[in-house]
Amino acid sequence: MERSDSRDLYNFVRASSLDKNSTLFDASQYEFFGQNLDDMELGGLDDDGVIAPVLGHADDDEYHLFDKGEGAGLGSLSDMDDLATTFAKLNRVVTGPKHPGVIGDRGSGSFSRESSSATDWTQDAELTSWLDEQDQEAKRWSSQPQSFAHSKPLYRTSSYPQQQPQLQHYNSEPIILPESNFTSFPPPGNRSPQASPGNLHRAPSLPGGSQLTYSAPSPLSNSGFHLSGLSQGPHYGGNLTRYASCGPTLGNMVQPHWVTDPGHLHGDHSGLLHNLVQQQHQQLPPRNAIMSQHLLALQQRQSYAQLAALQSQLYSSYPSPSRKVPFGVGEVREHKHKSSHRSRKNRGLSQQTSDAASQKSETGLQFRSKHMTSEEIESILKMQHSNSHSNDPYVNDYYHQAKLAKKSAGSKAISHFYPAQLKDHQPRSRNSSEQHPQVHVDALGKITLPSVRRPHALLEVDSSPGFNDGSGDHKGSGKHLEQEPLVAARVTIEDALGVLIDIVDIDRTLQNTRPQDGGAQLKRKRQILLEGLATALQLADPFSKTGQKSGMTAKDDIVFLRIATLPKGRKLLTKYLQLLVPGTENARVVCMAIFRHLRFLFGGLPSDTLAAETISNLAKAVTVCVQAMDLRALSACLAAVVCSSEQPPLRPIGSSAGDGASVVLISLLERAAEVVVVPRVMHGNSNDGLWRASFDEFFNLLTKYCRSKYDTIRGQNQGSAADVLELAIKREMPAELLRASLRHTNDDQRNYLLNFGRKPSAISESASHARGGQINSESVRG
């Protein structure tokens, strides 16, 4: 269908205005989707005496709309001017993509349209006459006696929560339409070649149909009738070469700027568009007439359309609705400040984006940062890598290196199984518990607590006020977790094991290296750690210079007993005894504590194999430590057995109930037998008296136990055969312990043992064995 020219359409509109049934357009009767328009105001152009015509293209669909004979539904010419004014107003207010909405309904016709982007403008030979006619029509509107005090503008409906006041805002993804065979008013025959490049691009809005926008008339602003094209399908075709012929400004200046500046690839491009507007504005003469003003708006739209088309062609973006901003005389002057402000803002954002892109291209790392440069991030990565990738195999490959060192123990190969750097221990008081311990996060992301003194609560429950008003058990349960006995013992065990590991590292370093000072500093550090661990165990020492030799209570070794209750605690004591230097005061103090609690430690053998092995290893460690003691330390340990409040389990070796106590006592007596010979040769020593007193008490304790055990066996085996009684006595009597004691007995003690078993033959044999051992002992001593 052929398109009507502008003169025929104008005559048709004038004829429609003579209809006697036509009425003026009342904007107050329309609401959009239930939104009240009472709070809106009617606005217009700033200059009363200047008329800014608004011209635009019209798509074929809109011409089809008039060719179908629906022109009668448009109303009078006054209504048409009213609609044109509203159209210009809506295009000036709406800045974002909107959903389609019905704008008006007049008589037999109802027209609506969606928001569209900036359209191209053309001029022809009839432009001057068209503007004159529109000026006369505006004067006729101004002469009508109608009040517009309560008139309100019609705003397009939108699902957006807010309206943005920016006017010169264009979408970065325009839609490219194929070229049309016709221009807007006037007809194509009179098209000017200077204005024709603007026809290369038309950006439609959301697809959905051709619509018109209507507006209430205003006495202060009159605009020309404006129709804009609307796309009906995905018209994305076009050739990039046709945009190169739009002029030197676009082909030579705009295109390299879009290609080289990465900041405009993201976000708003209103700053760049505004710069083009300013360049066009500076090239125009002063706006003294309507024609010069129209030419300004015309060139602005050409630049916008061409720039948007070039961007879409270069980057093949998806179609999205653009924003249409018709520029009049007052609009260019009104929004110049806002556009410049946004342009400066967008230039800053573009610069930041360009910096981030340059960092990524230079370093090659796939990361972006807002507050840090790539050099700073690289330095942090290097520090993290150095912390998480240590070159010390003792730390990274400990178990494999330990296996290799164990295999090469018998060979002459040099072992490198020692740490490259020792830990630096900070002095800390045992009672100074941190309320908020620091949580250390290593380079691998593992969270390591300094200790288990403050374990995280699995569940925090606030008890009711009446809960603590009950019995004393409820009150006791409200104490802190660290105050629980076993929890405190576990905390001490973990801390002590950490200290022992550091001591082992020092020993390996001294064994495999040769320090300049001969290892004096490391040995001193090792001694300090051992003393600190002995202090943490809170062991009582009656023979110390500041200690009390009498008056010990059961609470003196409470920490030691709680640690020894747990199998891990007994392992700790075993390892500690192995690391102690034999014959030192610390070794004596620990061994005295063990001898004071022989029944607690070796009273029973647990059913668990690992726990039983732990007890056996502890007895062996004590035996090794005792073998290096002097007579004073041996006397102190034997006195600890005598002064204990618990009777030691004096069982025979190999007893199913456990023979740990007998093993350590036999080792002590044997070591004392080796040491006591020297004082007799040297004729006098002060420690001999201490040992003599300690042994006498121990012998009385041993004989009482043997007498009690003998009576118990006889009572259980009354009427039994002699061989049965003899087997029971051998199974229960500590013959090995009695034999080890004969070397330290005097004449009275030996006579007691001789008279001990004269009644039955089995006891006589036991006594004779004791006498024979005593004789052999005396013959050895000489």
Curated annotation (Swiss-Prot):
InterPro entries documented for this protein: Pat1-like
Organism superkingdom: Eukaryota
Biased composition (Low complexity): 108-117
Disruption outcome: Enhanced root distal stem cell differentiation and increased mitotic activity in root quiescent center.
Keyword vocabulary terms for this entry: Cell cycle, Cell division, mRNA processing
GO terms for cellular component: endoplasmic reticulum; Lsm1-7-Pat1 complex; nucleus; P-body
Stretches with biased composition (Polar residues): 208-217, 348-366
Keyword Cell cycle: yes
Subunit structure: Interacts with AFPH2/NINJA.
Protein name per the record: Protein PAT1 homolog 1
